[in-house]
């Protein structure tokens, strides 16, 4: 399938002047012949393979490949179409280039029917702007129409390399950013030609090109979003939970994103295209909730100057139907059940340039967000995102189920630890508040490093007087909780159920009782002083709560019912209380494998088998006193009293010859496969046939004198 780099006359039906000229001066008139034969619309089927392509060479694909028929495409004569060569220089050349070193190959060279060069034209991808034709597409993975088989190098490599570089420049300029609403299926429509005046309607793009195309459009969308959205609110990502409870995704923007709305923000859009209205509604609800709480600032609240100049990380609030449960560092709060008030969004990304302008609103939204929060539902989990911290300065809080609180505090060297954590630990007495603080310095970072963020999550649970535990679950009963306690009876039943449990579980119950007492006393006094849980006590009770989280949920009725069911299902040991003569009769009816199992299971059964000399029902030991001392034919073991062992070794005395090679040895013939010795591995000392007359005579003589006990 190699194309020759020299001119070769393929058909004799050509005009004589063309064939003579190509035979005499092939290299001088090569470019002219290429322009006349390939650029014109009248193309004969015996086009010569060109060794090099000019910059203006552009060839149209064949619709019908026929060797002797002139294909009229535009209705012009060959002379007229050859004069229009210079007007078509902007059209892209339909060439195939194999790698960086090889030159372009003329894939429109069609010769004899059945030739391999004709197949090349069949397999060439149709990337011209006028026609799509009836050609095959060999693969949609070919990049830039590149063929997959090896071709010979063309003669003029310099021109080929220049043309390849031009094609790559054209491809890099072709992808114009478009709105993100256009899906992946429209990627092939937006491929613009070299001159920029046309599109390739059906061009198959590779995966790499589609990915680059989508990245270009995503960056264009981000630039447009930074112009439209003044504050760049957090975009919501649905991560597999219920439809009404999305999670807050990451949103990053430049430090001056609030003062300069036209600046591009590195905003990653993660919501599915099927639910855009739900995302917009939730963003509007978040904004309205933040605006609602702006007027509730207290005098001793958190200052913006030292902690609000940070970037927003990622908070995952999952698996909840009561979505009004927590807030992020910038006042972003989930509120699907609140009223929709689509006002301007409260600032999510606050840079140093807008610190003075946004501080009162942000402080009010931050301080007022803990007023009407319902208790923490099940499955809320906060964790650390990718963080750049000093060594030993991380905080991770994980609430794995609704009954235990796991907190790890390693605030050692954070520059904002003394002020931030004290504010994050203070919670009002009537709610369970979940805070998430994402603090990353923006001043020392360029836009490439802005994706590194810290997510510090702190969860502190408070207990009311009427509900003396942190087990405040939903109103509807959860499936599978039949034997579990209601939340009000948890502490009283847990203390009496786990009397024999570990020391950690008792400490956990004492911790909960102490927390309940503190909250009750605070509510009776009516003071608004928040309850501050010390970090050392929370850190010390981490293994305690985790170890006892599953034991303390079960009621006493369930334990009693389970014990009764276990007693009914437990096998009763009646056999050990039977008299010996009944047990001996039962054992003599058992095969060898069953007796082996009984002997190895219980010492009492082993004593009975050996003392009463119990033989298995399928035993092959000879009972005749003349042969009872004979060993096993297979393993040469002699019989002892109470031996119920299996024979573990089989000789293979029989040779099975094969016609095509060495045979194999067998322990028995095929007709004796049902014999117990082959299947079970029983001991056998039958050396002499029992029905022999000599054996009968000897047996009669020894019958009167035999006084030994039969084995």
Swiss-Prot record:
InterPro entries: F-box-like_dom_sf, F-box_dom, FBXO34/46. Keywords: Ubl conjugation pathway. Residues 10-23, 354-364 have a biased composition (Basic and acidic residues). Transmembrane segments: none annotated. The keyword Cell inner membrane does not apply. Residues 1-36, 249-271, 337-372, 494-529 are annotated as: Disordered. The keyword Membrane does not apply. Residues 572-624 form the F-box domain. PROSITE patterns: FBOX. It comes from the Eukaryota. PANTHER family: F-BOX ONLY PROTEIN 34 (PTHR16271:SF11), F-BOX ONLY PROTEIN 34/46 FAMILY MEMBER (PTHR16271). Substrate-recognition component of the SCF (SKP1-CUL1-F-box protein)-type E3 ubiquitin ligase complex. Directly interacts with SKP1 and CUL1. This is F-box only protein 34. It comes from Homo sapiens (Human).
């Amino acid at each position: 399938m190699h194309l020759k780099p020299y001119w070769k006359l393929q058909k004799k039906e050509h005009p004589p002047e063309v064939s003579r000229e190509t035979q005499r001066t092939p290299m001088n008139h090569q470019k002219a012949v290429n322009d006349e034969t390939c650029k014109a619309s009248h193309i004969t089927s015996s086009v010569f393979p060109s060794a090099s392509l000019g910059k203006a060479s552009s060839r149209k694909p064949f619709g019908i490949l026929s060797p002797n028929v002139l294909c009229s495409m535009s209705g012009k004569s060959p002379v007229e179409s050859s004069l229009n060569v210079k007007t078509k220089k902007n059209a892209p050349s339909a060439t195939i280039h194999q790698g960086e070193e090889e030159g372009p190959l003329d894939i429109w060279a069609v010769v004899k029917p059945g030739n391999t060069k004709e197949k090349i034209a069949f397999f060439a991808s149709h990337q011209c702007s006028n026609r799509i034709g009836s050609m095959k597409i060999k693969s949609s993975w070919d990049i830039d129409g590149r063929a997959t088989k090896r071709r010979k190098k063309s003669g003029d490599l310099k021109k080929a390399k220049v043309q390849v570089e031009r094609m790559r420049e054209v491809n890099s300029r072709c992808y114009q950013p478009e709105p993100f609403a256009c899906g992946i299926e429209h990627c092939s429509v937006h491929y613009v030609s070299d001159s920029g005046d046309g599109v390739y309607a059906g061009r198959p793009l590779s995966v790499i090109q589609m990915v680059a195309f989508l990245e270009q459009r995503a960056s264009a969308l981000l630039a447009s979003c930074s112009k439209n959205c003044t504050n760049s609110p957090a975009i919501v990502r649905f991560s597999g939970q219920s439809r009404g409870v999305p999670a807050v995704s990451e949103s990053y923007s430049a430090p001056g994103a609030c003062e300069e709305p036209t600046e591009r923000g590195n905003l990653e859009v993660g919501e599915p295209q099927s639910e855009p209205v739900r995302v917009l509604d939730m963003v509007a609800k978040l904004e309205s909730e933040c605006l609602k709480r702006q007027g509730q600032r207290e005098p001793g609240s958190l200052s913006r100057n030292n902690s609000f100049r940070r970037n927003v990380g990622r908070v995952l609030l999952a698996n909840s139907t009561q979505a009004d449960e927590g807030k992020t560092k910038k006042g972003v709060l989930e509120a699907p059940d609140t009223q929709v008030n689509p006002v301007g969004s409260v600032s999510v990304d606050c840079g140093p340039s807008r610190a003075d302008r946004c501080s009162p609103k942000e402080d009010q939204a931050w301080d007022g967000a803990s007023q009407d929060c319902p208790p923490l539902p099940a499955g809320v989990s906060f964790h650390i995102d990718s963080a750049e911290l000093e060594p030993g300065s991380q905080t991770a809080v994980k609430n794995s189920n609704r009954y235990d609180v796991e907190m790890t505090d390693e605030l050692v060297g954070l520059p904002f630890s003394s002020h931030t954590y004290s504010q994050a630990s203070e919670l009002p007495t009537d709610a369970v508040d979940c805070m998430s603080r994402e603090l990353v310095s923006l001043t020392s970072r360029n836009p490439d490093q802005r994706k590194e963020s810290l997510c510090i999550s702190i969860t502190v649970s408070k207990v009311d007087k009427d509900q003396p535990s942190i087990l405040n679950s939903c109103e509807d009963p959860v499936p599978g909780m039949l034997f579990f306690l209601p939340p009000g009876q948890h502490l009283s039943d847990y203390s009496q159920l786990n009397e024999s449990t570990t020391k950690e579980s008792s400490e956990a119950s004492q911790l909960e009782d102490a927390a309940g007492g503190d909250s009750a006393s605070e509510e009776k006094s009516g003071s608004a002083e928040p309850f501050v849980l010390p970090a050392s006590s929370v850190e010390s009770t981490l293994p305690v709560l985790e170890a006892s989280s599953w034991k303390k949920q079960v009621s006493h009725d369930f334990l009693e019912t389970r014990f009764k069911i276990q007693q009914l299902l437990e096998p009763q040991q009646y056999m050990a209380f039977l008299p010996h003569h009944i047990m001996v009769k039962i054992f003599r009816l058992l095969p060898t494998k069953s007796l082996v199992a009984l002997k190895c299971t219980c010492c009492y059964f082993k004593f009975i088998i050996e003392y009463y000399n119990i033989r298995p029902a399928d035993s092959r030991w000879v009972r005749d006193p003349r042969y009872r001392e004979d060993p096993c034919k297979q393993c040469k073991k002699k019989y002892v009293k109470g031996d119920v062992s299996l024979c573990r070794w089989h000789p293979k005395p029989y040779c099975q010859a094969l016609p095509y090679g060495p045979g194999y040895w067998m322990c028995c013939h095929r007709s004796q496969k049902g014999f117990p010795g082959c299947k079970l591995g029983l001991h056998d000392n039958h050396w002499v046939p029992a029905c022999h007359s000599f054996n009968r005579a000897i047996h009669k003589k020894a019958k009167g004198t035999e006084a030994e006990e039969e084995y």
